[in-house]
């Protein structure tokens, strides 16, 4: 479905401006219901992750509640520089859709397996059994969190 030829795929690996252009290229392929943040916010997330990685000098563990375009930014960062990400979203269909998009676009071009980087949990992040507190049991500590699920607080 998202099988395409990106013009400068060899430059994406260098983590240059081309990485950001590629991120926006893939983001704009998403339907509106999966693309809820502006391009500038998506790029900002990607840049913050790059800065954080350089500062901490390690592969990052990323966490998000809700999924969508932010997932693309976080996944691209992990695909380029290493790392793991965890996403909680009660909409399992959305997670499945995003996994397909990521696999067909970013995964195919960068030759990475989405399942080795991204852990999608189709439950409420506050669930006592499978919510965010599971990371403690896994002895994982998040380096960056993006909370973008319920907008009713």
Predicted regions and their residues:
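A short alpha-helical cap/connector motif
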Residues: 1-145, 150-153
């Amino acid at each position: 479905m998202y099988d395409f030829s990106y013009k400068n795929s060899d430059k994406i690996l260098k983590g240059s401006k081309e990485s950001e252009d590629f991120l926006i290229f893939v983001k704009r392929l998403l339907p509106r219901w999966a693309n809820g943040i502006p391009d500038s916010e998506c790029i900002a997330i990607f840049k913050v992750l790059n800065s954080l990685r350089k500062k901490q000098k390690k592969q990052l563990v990323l966490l998000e509640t809700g999924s969508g375009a932010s997932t693309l930014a976080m996944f691209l960062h992990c695909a380029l520089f290493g790392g793991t990400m965890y996403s909680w979203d009660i909409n399992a269909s959305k997670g499945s859709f995003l996994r397909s998009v990521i696999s067909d676009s970013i995964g195919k071009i960068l030759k990475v397996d989405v399942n080795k980087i991204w852990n999608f949990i189709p439950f409420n992040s506050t669930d006592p059994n499978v919510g965010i507190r599971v990371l403690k049991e896994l002895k994982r500590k998040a380096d960056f969190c993006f909370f973008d699920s319920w907008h009713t607080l």
